[in-house]
Amino acid sequence: MLLFETVREMGHEQVLFCHGKNPEIKAIIAIHDTTLGPAMGATRLMPYVNEEAALKDALRLSRGMTYKAACANIPAGGGKAVIIANPENKTDDLLRAYGRFVNSLNGRFITGQDVNITPDDVRTISQETNHVVGVSEKSGGPAPITSLGVFLGIKAAVESRWQSKRLDGMKVAVQGLGNVGKNLCRHLHEHDVKLFVSDVDPAKAEEAKRLFGATVVEPTEIYSLDVDIFSPCALGGILNSHTIPFLQAQIIAGAANNQLENEQLHSQMLTRKGILYSPDYVINAGGLINVYNEMIGYDEEKAFKQVHNIYDTLLAIFDIAKEQGVTTNDAAKRLAEDRISNSKRSKSKAIAA
């Protein structure tokens, strides 16, 4: 990887490589764009196969956060942090050392919890910096509001594809039954949707069967089901050259991040196949909305009102895609980049005045 060329192509402002010997720490903080506000992005801790994989993850996810904030009309930019470590080696000393790196950015980057980082870990990080979210329990966690946003996104996709506001009788395959996936199943079940579910943890799948009458399928079978909607709520990169040919769903709308293994190639494959794709960073913006409201003083009513905007934003994106003959992924980027450009122009005019 040519580092500066990659950073330039992706539009990043800053990439911070964090290294320490006592305790030993390797971390990367990627700041993509701060036009709309400070970069917000969670921290994940993973034993990446190599440093390049960690960097790619940070760069791609931070860019996605920029687009997510812009599409959600949140005054924040995009960032992401990755700690390269085995979860078994996670210690308070390591987390506090990381917190000091975050603090050195003086509020330019605000972080929270992601893979292998717990609320308790966030509280440990907060001993070294105030630039974290997820310390307060007032917001009740991001899962309820994230799942609501995904549910509203599914409704928007159904309206765009079939000009219908009804979900009853539709068949939906949900991949991944963590907190968001489980909450989404509850919303869908309440609207008389026929659920098909899969999870690498059989206990979670059986719970969905018991609670929501879902049909449990093997993780490898979830792609090829004859369903109306496929909702990926687990890992990223699952929409790829291997899985897309198996898809029978006409809509993809789920909570997982970075669903497209290759954004350009695989969004085009979905479009050619006639599948309406709901861009992940738009439909799953509820989590960002939740933590942003926590940062400014949590107001549940305001947060839930903001998440309802996901419905209208997706309808606008679907319309742009149709009118301009582009993929929905490109349409979402254009919407986000227009909002960022408009903000830059407004700031330039204000400075000139």
From Swiss-Prot:
Function field: Catalyzes the reversible oxidative deamination of L-tryptophan to indole-3-pyruvate in the presence of NAD(+). Cannot use other L-amino acids and D-Trp. Involved in the biosynthesis of scytonemin, a cyanobacterial radiation-absorbing pigment.
Classification of source organism: Bacteria, Bacillati, Cyanobacteriota, Cyanophyceae, Nostocales
Enzyme class: oxidoreductase
Catalytic center residues: K80
Protein name listed in UniProt: L-tryptophan dehydrogenase
Family: Belongs to the Glu/Leu/Phe/Val dehydrogenases family.
Annotated keywords: NAD, Nucleotide-binding, Oxidoreductase
Source organism of this protein record: Nostoc punctiforme (strain ATCC 29133 / PCC 73102)
Temperature profile: The activity significantly decreases to less than 20% of the original activity after 24 hours of incubation at 4 degrees Celsius.
Record's keyword annotation contains Transferase: no
GO molecular function per UniProt: L-leucine dehydrogenase activity; nucleotide binding
Residues that coordinate or bind NAD(+): R44, D114, T146, G176, L177, G178, N179, V180, G181, K204, A255, A256, N257
EC nos: 1.4.1.19
Catalysed reactions, as listed in the record: L-tryptophan + NAD(+) + H2O = indole-3-pyruvate + NH4(+) + NADH + H(+)
GO biological process, one term: amino acid metabolic process
Quaternary structure and interacting proteins, as annotated: Homodimer.
